[in-house]
């Protein structure tokens, strides 16, 4: 309830031109390109509150949402979807970008809720890894091609980058996890790299390329949508 009041309170306020300039930008660009000085502003805090609202109880986030836009009357609908288990994903930078913003905001203002939400996202990330080291496109619930190990749109590679940077303490992912968690991250990272090696397509005994998706059991190239054939 406090989050709702916080977000709605900001939504009712007038926005200056600088605020409007930020809101007109793509969410990914705000997260990746905003200077550290922006992160201590009220608008940056509002964006962080939106990130908390959008986080599913799975720990992940849905894709293709302009999370920095005012929530307004949509907030009740968003909160009603908190328990959805079939739209948390790393496709199109979802979850990755929200975790990055929370990490930056935690360093900037020290709000413990941002770290808590980040770690919840990390648990979602680690729980999604298959025993063979790969990740599906959506989890914990998925169907059809969503179950495949997914390289498309850098989904798995971005996940591995976050895991590596957390393990190695690379900004903005420094200081967020303890040594025991870093050991888990190291294991997950090496499993992921081994999966990449194991899914590399061999032609006449020579290692070549990868498909966008690979079967989670056989590791063979797999189809996705009707126009996304298992080509390479």
Features from the language model and the residues they span:
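Bacterial Sec-dependent N-terminal signal peptides
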Residues: 1-12
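Well-ordered alpha-helical scaffold segments within catalytic/enzyme domains
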Residues: 23-39, 47, 52-53, 96-111, ...
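Aromatic- and histidine-enriched alpha-helix N-cap/loop-to-helix transition segments
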Residues: 39-46, 89-97, 150-161, 184, ...
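Carbohydrate-binding/catalytic loop surfaces
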Residues: 67-85, 136-154, 206-231
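Short coil/linker segments at helix-helix boundaries
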Residues: 142-146, 172-184
């Amino acid at each position: 309830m406090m989050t709702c009041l916080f977000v709605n309170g900001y939504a009712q306020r007038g926005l200056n031109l600088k605020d409007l300039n930020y809101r007109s930008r793509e969410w990914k660009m705000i997260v990746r390109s905003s200077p550290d000085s922006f992160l201590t502003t009220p608008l940056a805090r509002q964006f962080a509150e939106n990130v908390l609202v959008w986080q599913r109880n799975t720990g992940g986030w849905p894709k293709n949402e302009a999370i920095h836009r005012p929530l307004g009357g949509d907030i009740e609908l968003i909160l009603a979807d908190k328990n959805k288990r079939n739209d948390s994903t790393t496709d199109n930078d979802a979850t990755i970008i929200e975790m990055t913003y929370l990490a930056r905001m935690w360093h900037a203002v020290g709000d413990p809720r941002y770290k808590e939400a980040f770690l919840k996202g990390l648990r979602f990330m680690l729980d999604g890894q298959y025993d063979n080291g790969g990740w599906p496109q959506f989890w914990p619930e998925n169907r059809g091609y969503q179950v495949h190990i997914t390289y498309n749109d850098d989904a798995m590679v971005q996940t591995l980058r976050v895991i590596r940077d957390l393990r190695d303490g690379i900004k903005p992912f420094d200081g967020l996890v303890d040594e025991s968690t870093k050991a888990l991250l190291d294991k997950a990272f090496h499993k992921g790299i081994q999966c990449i090696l194991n899914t590399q397509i061999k032609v006449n005994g020579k290692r070549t390329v990868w498909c966008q998706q690979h079967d989670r059991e056989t590791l063979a190239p797999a189809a996705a949508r009707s126009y996304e054939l298992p080509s390479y």
